[in-house]
Amino acid sequence: DSEFAELKIRGKIFQLPILKASIGEDVIDISRVSAEVNCFTYDPGFMSTASCKSTITYIDGDKGILRHRGYNIKDLAEKSDFLEVAYLLIYGELPSIEQYNNFTKQVAHHSLVNERLHYLFQTFCSSSHPMAIMLAAIGSLSAFYPDLLNFKEADYELTAIRMIAKIPTIAAMSYKYSIGQPFVYPDNSLDFTENFLHMMFATPCTKYKVNPIIKNALNKIFILHADHEQNASTSTVRIAGSSGANAFACISTGIASLWGPAHGGANEAVINMLKEIGSSENIPKYIAKAKDKSDPFRLMGFGHRVYKNYDPRASVLKETCKEVLKELGQLENNPLLQIAIELEAIALKDEYFIERKLYPNVDFYSGIIYKAMGIPSQMFTVLFAIARTVGWMAQWKEMHEDPGQKISRPR
């Protein structure tokens, strides 16, 4: 039986359908409110508004649950590789061995970018931020695939594969250009994560031997960042896509949104904060500063718009961080890790943080891992974009396959 919520306004009662969720909260359908009541709803930041139907990702922030297509994020991080999760997000099911092999071969086949793209890179000054370079490069792909500007249903999957394949190549090119080194071509004998590390750190005169611990850690980081419901950048991709814009342009808008310090740049802010704290002895002073509303200092890496419990991704990254630093001989003498662990322990026992449900989030440990790997801070958000492109493309594909989706037009 259908359920309804009642809205009473100006002496009249209107019935609003309640849509049943397969899991999580039900939703009140307000799509007819403006026509029937002559009023709009007001929800800054979309705090209580669902803009679409989706079966890709589920989050229960109160319980600290994150699932992709029904699979727990911790299980995926421990037992899958990134392209397996990419297949899951795009197609809805984990691949068979044959499907996985075919998918990875297609991604490898499309990893090379057009040589003319090199000329675009040369137009940037050497001090350009890698995100600025990547933003322009991804958007420029529209010019190289004019046949895909008007999409048919059969093109969605090929476009997703192309985007997933080319973004690590372009990301590594952005880094190489920013440090004045020659580009390194992808090596299709390597898997996705190995290939990215190869393109980042190899040079024409020096081969890069991939450390399996580093590869495994980066694989987990990519999985943990692959999708996260209708966040700012994903919503931006969907809004752009609702107009019929091509996928390359849509992903460019997602990258632009992700670049914002409140979204994708938080792990770099955590590193800067830990450096500012300087030593464990200073933690109480900075805890006090964080509580002081008149003090501009903020405790970065704590709290989340959705999670009111421990971010499940953060617990995986905490252990991954220890594994990486142990492998690199930094576990006992890495000052940033020591400060982070003690800061977390103190904050989790403090009533101020407990009452406000401020727990470590995914950004708290990821920057420490990147730094230990030798990845510079200006590349942190670039790596986030590599991972999140999988989610963006899955959401973009789902949006186009939804017959009820309309062009986005907030009032």
Curated annotation (Swiss-Prot):
Catalytic activity: oxaloacetate + acetyl-CoA + H2O = citrate + CoA + H(+)
GO MF entry, a single one: citrate (Si)-synthase activity
Active site: 304, 363
Pfam families assigned: Citrate_synt
PROSITE patterns attached to this UniProt entry: CITRATE_SYNTHASE
EC number: 2.3.3.16
SUPFAM superfamilies the record matches: Citrate synthase (SSF48256)
CC per GO annotation: cytoplasm
UniProt keywords, alphabetically: Transferase, Tricarboxylic acid cycle
Keyword Transferase: yes
GO BP, sorted A to Z: tricarboxylic acid cycle
Enzyme class of the recorded protein, top EC level: transferase
Keyword Transferase on entry: yes
Coiled coil region boundaries: none
Disulfide bonds: none
Gene3D superfamilies the record matches: 2.20.28.60, Citrate Synthase, domain 1 (1.10.580.10), Cytochrome P450-Terp, domain 2 (1.10.230.10)
Family classification: Belongs to the citrate synthase family.
Extra remark: Citrate synthase is found in nearly all cells capable of oxidative metabolism.
UniProt name for this protein: Citrate synthase
Organism encoding this protein: Rickettsia akari
Gene name, Swiss-Prot/TrEMBL: gltA
